[in-house]
């Protein structure tokens, strides 16, 4: 995200605290992060798939249903989750953007050890089905599964919690 964050993460690897990283290939400091990762051959490098709250890798003309006029995804994960339930051309746009993010990481020469997703949207049923399809074309050998629940529910669920539950159920 930021050069200072990248430097701190690489310092963590250099001191033995961190063994792998997940990169957002469309983030503003992604190039320097990929260069730094490439200089550390033992570092596991994964793709942190961004389909919400960030900029797309592809130009807007290729994915008009996914991004606003500036090429940014919706900022709220719940809004993205509802959007990605739609079928038709939207699924193909998602697939194209996911493919573009994978290819951008692989074009650096880095070996992709895993995938994760911003706000865990890589686990959305539509996105996960696309990742399963692409696994035969790319070295997707591991997909991060969060240890805990994505949402925490209390006795009195808010309407946001109920909507979030409905998206993934």
Which role does the model predict for each range below?
Residues 1-2, 83-95:
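Active-site mouth loops of central-metabolism enzymes
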Residues 3-27:
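A short alpha/beta connector and helix-capping loop motif
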Residues 9-15, 31-44, 65-71, 106-107:
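Acidic (Asp/Glu)-rich catalytic clusters
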Residues 18-22, 42-48, 111-116, 141-142:
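Structural preference for beta-strand elements that scaffold enzyme active sites
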Residues 24-28, 48-52, 118-120, 148-151:
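Active-site beta-loop-alpha junctions enriched in small/polar residues
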Residues 32-43, 54, 58, 129-138:
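Short amphipathic alpha-helices and their capping/turn segments at secondary-structure boundaries
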Residues 56-88:
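Active-site gating loops and adjacent loop-to-helix segments of metal-dependent hydrolytic enzymes
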Residues 90, 99-169:
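Catalytic domains of cell-wall/extracellular-matrix polysaccharide-remodeling enzymes
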């Amino acid at each position: 995200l930021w050069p200072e964050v990248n430097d701190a993460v690489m310092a963590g690897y250099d001191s033995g605290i961190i063994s792998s990283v997940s990169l957002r290939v469309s983030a503003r400091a992604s190039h320097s992060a990929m260069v730094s990762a490439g200089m550390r051959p033992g570092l596991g490098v994964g793709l942190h798939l961004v389909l919400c709250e960030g900029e797309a890798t592809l130009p807007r003309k290729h994915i008009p249903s996914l991004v606003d006029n500036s090429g940014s995804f919706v900022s709220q994960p719940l809004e993205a989750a509802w959007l990605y339930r739609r079928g038709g051309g939207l699924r193909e746009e998602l697939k194209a953007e996911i493919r573009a993010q994978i290819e951008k990481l692989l074009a650096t020469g880095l070996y992709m050890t895993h995938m994760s997703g911003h706000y865990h949207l890589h686990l959305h049923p539509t996105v996960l089905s696309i990742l399963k399809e692409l696994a035969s074309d790319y070295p997707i050998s591991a997909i991060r599964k969060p240890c805990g629940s994505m949402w925490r529910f209390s006795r009195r669920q808010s309407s946001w919690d109920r909507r979030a539950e409905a998206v993934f159920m």
